[in-house]
Amino acid sequence: MLSFEERAQLYKSESQAFQDYHKNLPNTDWNKQSACDEWLVSDVVAHLVGNSEFYSGTVSRGIRGESSPPEGRPEAGKGHPSMSADALAKSSIAAREKLGDSLLETYIDKDNYLIDLLTGLTSEERARPCYHPGSMVPAGNFVDLRFKEIVLHQWDIRSAIEEKAGLSSASLESMVILIEESFASGSLRWAFWSGTHLDKPVRYRFEVKSPVPVTADIVVEGDKFRYEPDAQRAADVTFRCHTHIFALLMYGRISAGQAISEGHLAVDGDRGLAEQFSQWFKGI
């Protein structure tokens, strides 16, 4: 596993490269539809501005020992995208409209402030709990949360503009840490959208070999799920893929059916059950 310092440096490099990408983005591309249903490319950037401000505030408070929810926010662990997706979509559009021509400049300023804050955390500060609606999170793991966010939203933008877009391989270890440790908006709980209770649970097994290995079962009961590392029971469906496909599936960027049809996801077991996986794991 990479150290905090190594992950922090990778996050910083990726964030700065993403800033450069936006500096060179033609004006016409800012008004294109992104992979996020309700957002233009510029709306995605406005969302990143808002999260920069939130992360900076919650980490600054957390390292001072203040971890209570800000006014208007749910208790840590009580928030979920199903409760806030519509409001989030509208607020990001409103922020983009308000920022106007200063959107890029504001994004870079807020992003750089957050980069300096997160990469400058001391070893003691990294362990201090900080508020997030998804869960309490050690300050140091906000590096992983922001890294994941930057890379996924980069995919949301680039996949809508370029013929081939993928996830940065440098980010995959941070994403796996978030999933396995169940941290806030990087967790499977955040990605899972509850449905009707199933009479019989479905056991999905992931066998991910590279570049970051993951072997785990996700047992879906319709209205809830559980994550079982290294489970030994027989699976209903076994998925085999690279880590970037695993991440895109978990965070709802591609469906299981699409990944199967494009040859990115190998399946053992019931094809119908395999394709149903994405009705539960939608991300935001």
Feature map (PLM): residue ranges:
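Acidic, aliphatic-rich amphipathic alpha-helical segments
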Residues: S123, A139-T215, Q279-I284
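C-terminal interaction segments
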Residues: A231-I284
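Alpha-helical scaffold segments that form or flank carboxylate-/histidine-based iron centers
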Residues: M1-Q9, W30-N51, S91-L103, C130-K148, ...
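A short mid-domain helix/strand-loop element embedded in enzyme catalytic domains
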Residues: D86-A87, D111, I115-P133, D144-A160
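A generic secondary-structure signal for well-formed alpha-helical elements
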Residues: H22, L48, S52-V59, I63, ...
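Helix-loop segments that flank and shape redox-cofactor active sites
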Residues: Q19-L40, R61-G65, G120-M136
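Glycine/small-residue-rich hydrophobic helix-like segments
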Residues: H197-T243
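Short, helix-capping/interhelical loops that line the mouth of catalytic, cofactor-
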Residues: M1-E6, Y55-G120
